[in-house]
Amino acid sequence: MKVLKLLSCIAFIIVLTSCERKYRWSPSECALQHYPARILTNNFQYKNGGGVGTLERVAGGSGWGYTGASYAVGERLKPVPDSLFVNWFSITEGKFYKGKFKLTSKKIEEALKKGQIRVYTCFAPHGRVVVYVAGKHGRAPIDRFRAIEDTSMTIAKHILKINGVKTEQEFEEKYGEKLDGSTYLKHYIKKEDSIYISKHGIPDTW
């Protein structure tokens, strides 16, 4: 009897999963023009498991609300994303942020039905995260969140990780120079960005 009930439950779950509507959409990211962010993780996860995400890269050139790179990931038709997992380095602040958020799936699905084909995450200083949809009807914000600072990660640890070494001594032996976090930051912050930030500071509302 128990076996029959278990099989019935499994069959019911399979039916629900197979009936889940899917849409044509792709993930992307963005950041403010003068406040670049190095995206470490930007994953949209499905309710029944799995998901799609973007690659690790620096965002910020497109400006707020405008999508960055286009990613042809996953199947052509995908389920509506249910949650978002993010982890990034706010370059202008020198801080790392992380968070996992429940998305307003109903709003996203309504937008996808209308022909929106891009679901993307915009990253701002102070852990601000805004999820947008975009397509033939323009773009619109769906959700706003605030991530927490990841104090376990530092610029030095990040540099060691992306260079495939474990200690500062290994870094010096490999590259013949001392690990310098300020040099790393200057590599991503343009002169015009520095001028803009010195005039306007780092705002906390988006």
What positions do the PLM features span?
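Sec-dependent signal peptide recognition
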Residues: 2-9
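C-terminal motif of bacterial Sec signal peptides marking the signal peptidase cleavage site
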Residues: 15-18
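Bacterial signal peptide processing site
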Residues: 20-22
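Structural motif
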Residues: 28-39
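Tryptophan-paired
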Residues: 42-92
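Edge beta-strands of extracellular beta-sandwich domains
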Residues: 95-102
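Low-complexity, Pro/Ser/Thr- and charge-rich linker/hinge segments at domain boundaries
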Residues: 103-133
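Activation corresponds to long, low-complexity, non-globular regions
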Residues: 127-206
